[in-house]
């Protein structure tokens, strides 16, 4: 499925980086190693908080570049610090973890990895969210910054964060002393590769970048029995089905039109055999919103509707509604985003830096921001430009993050990521050592 078309690719690379030949040469100098690391990581993904080999590979490479590296921060987290005279401390973060997804990209280096998920099930594992691109680009950026210390001053702090997909990894690192054992940064930087832009472009968003997220586990209680005698039972499967349908009215009938709100029931678990009515059913929900008041409205509505459906079904007791995870939206400091747009345009070309609206996905980088660290989180284009153009013309969507078919166009995406990160860091780290 992977295609390498040499002429368009070469033209794209030249277009992306032609605005700054120096950055282009620096990126080419580290590209081969970065791409080799990307392929290795893609073939060997690891689930949240089990990223032992991923973390070790990152730590080894950063040590080799002269960074002071600390492992096992917040579990499998990595912190690498490079001091270069007086000046600000700037943090650049990558995630380490992959997802329990069976890869179907057809790539020559597709993952065949398996692991045990938290409940103990054997699952396929894939870098279906692009964290392998993020790690490889961070290492390439780290190499450029280490080799060109005459172009900046201050302290560069690199973070390899575990458990982003569990939206708890950032908090674990903070709780383990991330900003007390190590320098607290003046600014934080991160990116995310997505197919919402073609490879070679980056997206800039001022203010709210993504959504609040809440994960709920709902247990509905019934009365089990024989499948041939449903009248002697209180069927939690039917209760679950009615609850799922009723929950769909929250967005369509309760939230003000125009407000972003998502209520997704992503998992349903009940029963063991066709002729056994179980005594309980479990739902897994994901809620998304931009505004705090909408977030609270969604949570309250889910609770009200779930309890009402259980009461209507004659449930023997109230449902158990557990808030198993949540995170606030990532907020891009507007003055910082405005400041960094210029260096990005200089490095990539003005046409390759676009303004983007907030996205509906979520992530826990917001926990770093909540520690009083103004930040800039931007989108890295990942789509093959030809496929992107064809999809836009046809009104179709390319495979998104978390899809088993998600396969960023790695070559131009990696080059663009490194050029962008270097440009941003040099701007914030202010020129030659003082």
Regions found by a protein language model. Name each.
Residues 238-434:
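Metal-dependent amide/peptide-bond hydrolase catalytic core
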Residues 22, 29, 33-36, 40, ...:
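Extracytoplasmic/secreted proteins, especially bacterial periplasmic and envelope-associated proteins
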Residues 19-127, 132-153:
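Acidic/His- and Gly-rich active-site-bordering loop/insert found
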Residues 5-15:
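Bacterial N-terminal signal peptides
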Residues 41, 62, 80, 92, ...:
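Divalent metal-coordination and catalytic microenvironments
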Residues 103-114, 207-211, 388-399:
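Short, flexible, mixed-charge acidic loops at enzyme active sites
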Residues 114-126, 132-133, 145-267, 272-278:
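Histidine/acidic-residue-rich, glycine-tolerant segments that coordinate divalent metal ions
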């Amino acid at each position: 499925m992977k295609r390498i078309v040499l002429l368009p690719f070469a033209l794209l690379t030249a277009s992306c980086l032609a605005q700054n030949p120096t950055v282009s040469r620096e990126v080419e100098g580290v590209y081969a190693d970065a791409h080799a690391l990307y392929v290795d990581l893609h073939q060997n993904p690891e689930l949240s908080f089990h990223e032992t080999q991923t973390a070790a590979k990152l730590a080894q490479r950063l040590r080799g570049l002269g960074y002071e590296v600390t492992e096992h921060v917040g579990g499998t987290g990595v912190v690498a610090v490079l001091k270069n005279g007086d000046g600000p401390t700037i943090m650049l973060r990558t995630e380490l973890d992959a997802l329990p997804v069976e890869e179907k990209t057809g790539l020559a280096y597709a993952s065949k990895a398996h692991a045990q998920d938290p409940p103990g099930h054997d699952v396929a594992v894939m870098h279906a969210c692009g964290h392998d691109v993020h790690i490889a680009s961070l290492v390439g950026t780290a190499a450029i910054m280490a080799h060109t210390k005459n172009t900046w001053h201050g302290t560069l702090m690199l973070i390899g964060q575990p458990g982003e997909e569990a939206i708890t990894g950032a908090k674990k690192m903070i709780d383990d002393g991330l900003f007390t054992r190590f320098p607290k940064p003046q600014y934080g930087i991160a990116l995310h590769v997505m197919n919402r832009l073609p490879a070679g472009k980056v997206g800039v968003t001022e203010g709210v970048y993504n959504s609040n997220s809440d994960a709920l586990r709902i247990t509905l209680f019934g009365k089990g029995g024989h499948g041939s005698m449903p009248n002697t039972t209180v069927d939690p499967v039917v209760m679950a089905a009615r609850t799922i349908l009723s929950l769909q009215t929250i967005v369509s009938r309760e939230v003000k039109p125009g407000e972003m709100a998502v209520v997704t029931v992503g998992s349903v678990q009940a029963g063991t055999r066709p002729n056994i009515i179980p005594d309980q059913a479990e739902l897994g929900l994901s809620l998304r919103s931009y505004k705090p008041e909408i977030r609270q409205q969604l949570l309250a509505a889910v609770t009200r509707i779930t309890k009402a459906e259980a009461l209507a079904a004659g449930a023997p007791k109230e449902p158990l509604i557990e808030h198993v995870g949540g995170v606030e939206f990532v907020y891009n400091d507007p003055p910082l985003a405005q400041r960094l747009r210029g260096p990005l345009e200089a490095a990539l070309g003005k046409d390759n830096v676009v303004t983007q609206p907030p996205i509906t996905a979520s992530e826990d980088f917001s926990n770093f921001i909540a520690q009083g660290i103004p930040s800039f989180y931007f989108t890295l284009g990942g789509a093959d430009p030809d496929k992107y153009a064809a999809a836009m013309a046809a009104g179709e969507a390319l495979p998104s993050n978390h899809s088993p078919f998600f396969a960023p166009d790695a070559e131009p995406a990696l080059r663009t990521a490194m050029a962008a990160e270097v440009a941003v860091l040099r701007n914030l780290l202010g020129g030659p050592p003082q």
